[in-house]
Amino acid sequence: MTNKSLFSPFSINNHELKNRFVMAPMTRNFAPDGIPSEYAPEYYAKRAKGGVALILTEGVEVSHPSSSGYPDVPNLTSSESKKMWSQVVKEVHKYNSKIFCQLWHVGGIRKPGIDKNKDVPGYTPSGLVKANKKVAYEMTLEDIQEMVSIYAKDAKICEELGFDGVEIHGAHGYLIDQFFWSDTNIRSDKYGGSLEKRTQFARDIIQACQNVTSKDFSVGIRFSQWKQQDYDAKLALNENELKTFVDCLSESKPDFFHTSMRRFWEPEMNNSSLAALVKGMTDIPVIGVGSVGLDKDFIRL
């Protein structure tokens, strides 16, 4: 891809983007009681005004008591938070940009006492946040089904608020990634074991979100090799495993993949980045991010 290509239009689902610049999600901790601050509409609108074609919001907690792991993270539960998100969307749309809401559950990263739901533990597939480190709650099949339903309900809320789509946060060692990762998923039912089974939770969520929203509403997923618990972690040890992973997720027909790399200049395997590898394995649009810095080339571009 040449620099010129970055400024060419691109489509995700039925959304035509004016260029190929995407603002990646960044946690801001500016949402007391889960309500985006009064400055949130201006914050996101500045990026749209600057020319970014697609904005992915900061992580937004799904509407379950166990979803929170950090202070002052926004949610979708109150009328006040919904009102602010609606204003954010309206401001972004003024500049012919699209905006997707990132739906986030931290999983076992949650520590009891982090918020008003003080006795609610961190939810995980197997009670693990790292190999042999069992410090969290192991989800039952009923818990999993409930969580899938909650993601779907929140996706529907996002569409009603005017968002153009949602990104399911499946990266960085949080809940969905804990299902992906063999170190934290040692289940023996349909949600654990093989790599294919470890993607089942994510596939169920993607399909559930699609089932309750319109065909023009985009549903995609973010994933990574690295975890905040282990920067050297791997979902896939080689290209064959990565292809299996991508193929499994593709069965749910997500509208995009968002590959998160700690260092975009460091090859993932075979001298290629994760984004490049995934792009070569699927026709589904691929977003890539990882430590973009303000070097001279970036400033000139």
Question: What are the residue ranges of the model-derived segments?
Answer:
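Flavin-dependent oxidoreductase catalytic cores
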Residues: 1-301
